[in-house]
């Protein structure tokens, strides 16, 4: 009888521990986590524009400011660098849309996905994958 009682107590404790581990973390904030990931790296992509290799580096700061750095590589070996400041913000705390406000235009990054050192999004209508450096 005492043995069965102890077994029931252990089963009850195991069940209660199992239920408590399914509870969501009240301090987990996906907005804060993805913002940290976004601001923790320089995001780099390569593409071709007017026959030139272009390296684009996006830098996001936690204060909502950022830099779009474009480095153009000419066949002659010459390199031109263009740094364009912007302001950025999430779309009403939804972390799948990001607005980048430049001096003369706005760019919307849609379907934003960040995992590890990879940042994928729909950038001006084209799928782009940035790598973190």
Name these PLM-found stretches.
Residues 2, 14-42:
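Bacterial Sec-dependent N-terminal signal peptides
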Residues 56-60:
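Broad, structure-driven detector of short, well-ordered beta-strand segments within folded domains
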Residues 131-133:
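Short, solvent-exposed mixed-charge patches
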Residues 1-9:
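Bacterial N-terminal signal peptides that target proteins for export
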Residues 8-10, 14, 35, 115:
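Residues marking helix boundaries in flexible regions
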